[in-house]
Amino acid sequence: MDKKTLEKYSSAFTLSDMEIFIFPDLLYALVLANIMSPEIWKWREDPWFTGIGKMGPLKKIHRVKQYVMEHYNFNLDLETWGLTDKQTEINRFNDFVDMEMLSRSNALFGYEGDKYYFDMDIRRHFGLDKFDSDIIPYWKTETVEAMNAFRYKPNHQAGAGECVSLACLYAAALFIVAEVPLEKIFLMGTPLHSQNFIMVDEGVLTNNRRIVTKSMWYNGTELSALARRALEHEQVTYIAHSSGWIHSMYPEATIDTVEYQLFREKLTKYLQTTIDFEIFMNFLRDYSRHQKFFQLCFQCQGANRFIQLEKAFGYEHGSKNRLGDKTGRKLYCEMDEEDLYLQPIDHRYRIYHEDELFELKPYQAFIDSLKNSFPGLVQHAEFFADLKKFVHTVPHLPSTKKEFTVARPIKISPGQSREEIITYLSSIRHSSFVIRHSESTSLIADLAFYAGRYMDSCDWKPFFKAAFERNPVSVEHFRDTDLQAVHAQLQSWPNESIYDGNRLALPDEVVNYLRGDGIEKAITLVNVAKARHLEVSLEQHNNMITVRHGKLKFDFTTVKKSSYIWNNLPIL
């Protein structure tokens, strides 16, 4: 296995943001690993999803969203997966990655973010300013098992994960529970965020735990503004799909060209809208600095009333009614008489719902009508620039000028069982631990078994490389503890793995979630010892794993029943 292949396959276990950025095959591999996991299939038995089969596609997606909202939190801290440094990671990748291009595209290697995205520097935003500038976080993308296991961490009552974890969770859940075909799901990554675009109805965007329909994209709320900012201000670095991937940094791409073109068309349509009174009011809700130009006019008891627009919007706070939509008239009734004028307010443009200006129009037709109605607005160029940005986002997608190569697409359907899917994915992997691929096999399918920790059928060398090189949290946790005390503390934790069968957790998962099978605890102890440059060995006798260091002997009991595990322990 050459250096690049070994790094790629070991990265399938740790799945840090930088590893997924450099090896785009890994993103969809995690989606498939989550689909193969029994965890999301259990959701189908939850009473919340009773009758979901009779629901329409969009309602199914909303149902999944509510489940995700109730069972998972967003988590992006520095403590869970620990820190590394730029030079260590550069040494891993510099033989096969253009580091200058990487620094322009990846937040951890120098990307500064769009000026509109943060009003402070990125390192301060993420809490890295207290460390040397060379220090960067691992930010590992969690499997569904690792996400679920957050509930075992102190001060966590639910599952959790960062944005890429949530995107991969959503993709798998929409396939398994909402029965959305994989062909309709596109995963998108920017230097600072990860979202999915689902080609259902007019389009649905996932954003961390939430979803954003087209109408929500234009509702002008704070939540929609948060969902919009990545696509408004950042380059979409890579896109992953069941047919393959495309990446702005690489000249080659494997995504199906027809599927990619369809995605571009659907996303572009999602990101532009015609304008009526509701859309215009939503724009002014989002870009509140322009409210000062307008007054709202409406009829009350047979006479016109006028109110400064910013005061009118103030009444939305604490009310379920909103200006611009069908509940707007109810909001008028909630306004205090002392804020209402009987005569038009000087120097403000009058807007009212019934004005033919607000009959549904394409953007340019609306702008022409607006300038005709309010000539004085023409001098405020920033107003028109913001309006255009609000109603028409131009996504910065990877160029189609790539060397497209044919990759075997993943052909599974929501009607298949978990067992059928695992059998199919197994059939299109390589047939031995020698990692070779042809047009009849799928690299992504193969990597999915590594991401899912199916150690019965994976080469252990990448696993041990990941376990002993990129699990700093377990090392730090036991920093001031001698090996006997490390063993005692590991033994005090529940002897249960977060992964079923013979799948294995990494040392930092054991320490984060305070539990593990005996072999996982043994590997954690070895990781701590190796970090101290101590010589250790592993032995197995039936269900007993023994770690030896000099005259010291540490026993662990395992219920993992794979003979292949024992055959590979000597690789240490």
Name each model-derived stretch.
Residues 1-433, 437-572:
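A structural boundary/capping signal
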